[in-house]
Regions:
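Class I (Rossmann-like) S-adenosyl-L-methionine-dependent methyltransferase catalytic domain
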Residues: 1-38, 63-141
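A short acidic, Gly/Pro-enriched loop at the edge of an enzyme's catalytic core
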Residues: 37-45
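A short, conserved alpha-helix within the catalytic core of class I
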Residues: 53-65
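Flexible, glycine/proline-enriched loop segments at strand-loop-helix junctions
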Residues: 51-54, 90
Length: 141
């Protein structure tokens, strides 16, 4: 990311996680086991493809850990996928409205994109007729 964006950076590692830190900007990327990641609470979170990559059984732990990393009224943007899981399964996994609301009741759905053109080949091959990206915004409760 940093090299592609031509942003000077440094790398630090504590043996568990690697931290890529921009030299002249307040921007860092942490790589490693998400459940071992600890930091001061963040003002915001943007989840473009993490929740949909987590198997259903781990999602409650993912949501709790994410919440533990946020300030009380942190801004939250989440993008989920919706499709017929009886025809194809993830990853990326479908995450439906009831599940999002169970984890973060304060989020509201603000838009969606019927992204058939962006559908991964395995879903297209399964004959899915709908593949929706849903956009959620808000502050977690």
């Amino acid at each position: 990311f940093f090299a592609d964006a031509d942003i000077p950076f440094e790398v630090e590692s504590d043996g568990r996680l690697s931290r890529f830190q921009a030299r002249q900007r307040k921007l860092s990327i942490h790589c490693g086991d998400y459940f071992k990641f600890r930091a001061e609470p963040f003002d915001a979170v943007y989840d473009r493809a993490a929740l949909v990559a987590v198997p259903p059984g781990l999602r409650p732990a993912y949501a709790r850990h994410t919440q533990s990393l946020l300030k009380a009224h942190a801004a939250h943007m989440l993008i989920t996928l919706e499709y017929d899981q009886s025809r194809a399964n993830g990853p990326p996994y479908a995450v439906l409205t009831d599940e999002v609301k169970a984890y973060w009741p304060g989020l509201r759905r603000v838009g969606e994109l019927g992204a058939l053109s962006n559908m991964p080949p395995k879903f297209r091959d399964a004959g899915l007729g709908a593949f929706i990206e849903a956009v959620w915004l808000g502050a977690p409760d």
